[in-house]
């Protein structure tokens, strides 16, 4: 049995110490890291509870329950940040990526502790794939919210649409992994390629301007 709350405390403790040492300017980054890991911790409990209540099998829990719960949990601290502080567009994007990155980091650490780290090639691909998938979902939600929250009439509809897009991408990723074989490695490679393609497109657009 993996006591993920103990892992959470061990990972958050140095972040809290660093946050106190770095000052107010860097405090936001550490708080979003902690929020992302906390969202991952709560997602694990909620996923387990809903899977038990719905009597879902492993595939249903992975492809139907987990993407919805995890993306909603990642969105909550971001919405709180938007409602309370009303940040600028770039700060929204940075916050979403930080939450997604810390979520993926905590998830990978728990996976390693539970399943071991003896298969380097598999762990390597999974680490990059899972991290890129969560970051890609963060880019979709964060970049979209930076646009939609500047327009009052788009806030609710835009947020729901972005959440739906992130959930769909997340579910496709889990379905490919659940299928196994070559599809599993396609799932790991796809988010990395999409992030790289998006970054390249943004770079080219910046050069044209």
Regions found by a protein language model. Give the residues of each.
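Hydrophobic alpha-helical segments at protein termini of multi-pass membrane proteins
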Residues: 1-209
């Amino acid at each position: 049995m993996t006591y993920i709350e103990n892992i959470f405390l061990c990972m958050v403790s140095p972040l809290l110490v660093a946050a106190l040492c770095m000052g107010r300017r860097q405090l936001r980054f550490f708080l979003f890291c902690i929020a992302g890991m906390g969202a991952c911790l709560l997602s694990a409990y909620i996923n387990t509870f809903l899977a038990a209540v719905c009597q879902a099998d492993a595939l249903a829990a992975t492809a139907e329950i987990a993407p919805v719960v995890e993306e909603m949990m990642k969105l909550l601290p971001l919405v709180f940040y938007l409602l309370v502080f009303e940040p600028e567009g770039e700060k929204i994007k940075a916050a979403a990526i930080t939450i997604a990155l810390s979520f993926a980091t905590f998830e990978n650490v728990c996976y390693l502790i539970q399943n071991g780290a003896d298969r380097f090639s598999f762990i390597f691909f999974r680490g990059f794939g899972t991290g890129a998938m969560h970051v890609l979902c963060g880019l979709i939600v964060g970049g979209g919210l930076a646009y939609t929250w500047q327009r009052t009439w788009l806030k609710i509809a835009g947020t729901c649409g972005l959440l739906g897009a992130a959930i769909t991408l997340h579910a496709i990723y889990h379905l490919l992994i659940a299928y196994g074989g070559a599809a599993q490695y396609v799932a790991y490679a796809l988010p990395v390629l999409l992030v790289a393609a998006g970054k390249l497109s943004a770079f080219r657009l910046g050069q044209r301007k």
